[in-house]
A protein has these predicted regions:
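Compositionally biased, low-structure terminal segments
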Residues: 12, 60-62, 296, 306
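Acidic, metal/ion-coordinating pockets
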Residues: 23-292, 330-336, 342, 352, ...
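Compositionally biased regions
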Residues: 11, 21, 54, 145, ...
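Non-Sec secretion/translocation targeting segments of pathogen effectors
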Residues: 1-23
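Compositionally biased, intrinsically disordered low-complexity segments
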Residues: 8, 12-14, 26, 49, ...
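Catalytic centers of hydrolytic enzymes
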Residues: 27-30, 36-42, 179, 262-514
Length: 514
């Protein structure tokens, strides 16, 4: 359980001279922010987060404390209206008053986008959209707003990701609506303009709801004045606590700026406790990250969500479930292995590949229903079968292994069926073998892979279309088979066909050594 009151990290104003470094804390303002980002339509984790939010609401502080509920975007996902209505209901359930516009809020077709956000319970914020004032979007999205709690005014600003158009499915449609994000340099200027506007109104506590990503958030923090907190998203970092040069930076004028982010897929949420001096400068802070799996699913939220999406069907039973991953981009994932096996079996391919970025869900011991299945890989990427050379497969595995040392661990390692490999913690592949359908292991020379050896491969349409740097897999238009179903369908069919409860365990097909 999270204790949202302990203020155990203290820092003062780092000004240009001794006088400006002095902090007056005679009349501090205390603030506690419950924040969420990048839930990606995950209804089950939303249900758990509702329980956590309710606990936050019930908590009584020893001293007067303002409470805020804020989001940093990508609470929605995809074009499924039901999924996105659940996301909006979630924001209403937990009482979020403002949210940044993320790229996944824009996944829908433009007509659906505008229809659905009409009912958005929170204020949509994005100051860095370059579009005419008469654009339809400007009627729904504000650059900033002011929220007043117990007589204290908080200025809230939002940013949309600069790579928006490349990250949404209907980019051309949204371009037709004159939706164009600013680049980072322009974004910094637009953010500063909003800060200055709020400051001129007497607001001295400024929170940026950013869906720009961690790297850009750091640039914004260092190159602006007046921002106190950046509640971040988009890059899926998990920033626990407060550490200098990690998520504590200083503005151009030397004031502290705290950056937060709570990972992805609703696995976590955050509570940021703050104390401001009379000038609106942070003097104390604590940043706690909570895990949604530590909280039960809220019964009322579950009922409402099922009314929106339909009641799920129980399809099987999990006898052994794998433990939660600490890093779901770089760790062996037994559920991904199960999914890859399902793809290989259903397509009859020699091997199957699943990029770690596509694995978003988890299973627990006990009965499993279709609502759990649909959250395992929510992107609905269709499966194809493609002939790849041994060299192309080796190059893909080697490329994915480098994720363990790359920034943000992207694109993530490649999960496999019909293969097994060993890699080091430095991201070097040291061995690779093909496992034929009779279980025979055939070593592959990773230093001299064959170009005349072909493997039929089950893979999705995303990773076979030159995304995430996998240029060696860019053969979508050479597919020998195209299927109308996705990874979730394959997993569901495998579970339904099981005659006994299922054990999902690590079989050692990917080993990471020192």
């Amino acid at each position: 359980m999270i204790n949202p009151i302990k203020y155990n990290i203290s820092f003062g104003y780092r000004g240009a001279d001794n006088n400006s470094a002095e902090v007056n804390t005679k009349k501090p303002v205390r603030t506690s922010i419950f924040y969420v980002n990048d839930f990606h339509g995950k209804a089950i984790n939303m249900e758990r987060a509702v329980t956590a939010s309710n606990a936050f609401d019930r908590f009584t502080f020893q001293k007067p404390t303002d409470k805020l509920k804020l989001a940093s975007g990508d609470i929605m996902l995809g074009e499924d209206i039901g999924v996105n209505r659940v996301a909006m209901q979630f924001l209403k359930f937990i009482g979020v008053t403002a949210t940044a516009v993320g790229n996944h809020e824009c996944d829908m077709k433009s007509e659906d986008f505008f229809s659905e956000i009409t009912g958005m319970p929170a204020t949509l914020l994005a100051c860095n959209i370059k579009n005419p004032q008469d654009s339809k979007l400007s009627k729904y999205v504000q650059k900033s707003c002011v929220q007043e709690i117990n007589g204290t005014k908080y200025g809230l600003i939002g940013t949309i990701p600069s790579d928006l158009i490349s990250r949404i499915k209907y980019g051309k449609v949204l371009q037709d609506q004159n939706i164009q994000p600013a680049n980072i340099d322009e974004t910094i200027k637009y953010v500063q303009d909003e800060v200055d506007k709020l400051k001129s109104q007497g607001v001295d506590k400024i929170i940026l709801l950013s869906h720009s990503g961690y790297g850009y958030d750091i640039k914004i923090a260092k190159n602006t004045n007046g921002i106190d907190v950046i509640l971040g998203g988009h890059s899926h970092n998990l920033l626990n606590g407060i550490q200098k040069d990690i998520n504590l930076f200083y503005s151009k004028s030397g004031e502290p700026v705290i950056i937060t982010q709570a990972g992805r897929d609703g696995k976590n949420f955050g509570i940021l406790n703050l104390e401001f001096d009379k000038n609106g400068v942070i003097t104390k802070a604590q940043n706690n990250i909570g895990t949604t799996r530590d909280f039960s699913r809220n019964a009322i939220a579950r009922y409402i969500f099922e009314k929106i999406k339909g009641k799920p069907e129980i399809i099987g039973e999990i006898r052994t479930a794998p433990p939660a991953l600490k890093n779901d981009l770089t760790e062996p994932n037994p559920l991904a292995y199960y999914g890859a096996d399902a793809l290989r079996e259903l397509t009859g391919a020699d091997i199957a590949l699943i990029g770690a970025a596509n694995m978003r869900g988890y299973v627990e011991k006990g009965k499993i229903d279709t609502s759990v299945i649909e959250e395992i890989s929510p992107f609905k990427n269709k499966i194809v079968k493609i002939n790849y050379t041994e060299k192309e497969i080796v190059d893909a595995i080697k490329y994915s292994a480098k994720s363990i040392k790359s920034r943000n661990n992207k694109p993530g390692i490649m999960y496999v069926s019909g293969l097994k490999y060993t890699m080091t913690k430095e991201g070097d592949v040291t061995s690779l073998s093909y496992i034929d359908k009779q279980g025979k292991e055939c070593p592959i020379d990773i230093n001299n892979p064959r170009t005349d050896k072909i493997y039929s491969t089950a893979i999705n349409d995303y990773f076979s279309s030159n995304n995430d740097g996998y240029d060696m897999l860019n053969k979508y238009f050479e597919a020998t088979e195209r299927y109308s179903w996705d990874l979730n369908y394959a997993i569901e069919q495998k579970i339904r066909a099981a005659k006994e409860p299922i054990d999902i365990v690590d079989d050692g097909r990917i080993i990471i050594t020192d």
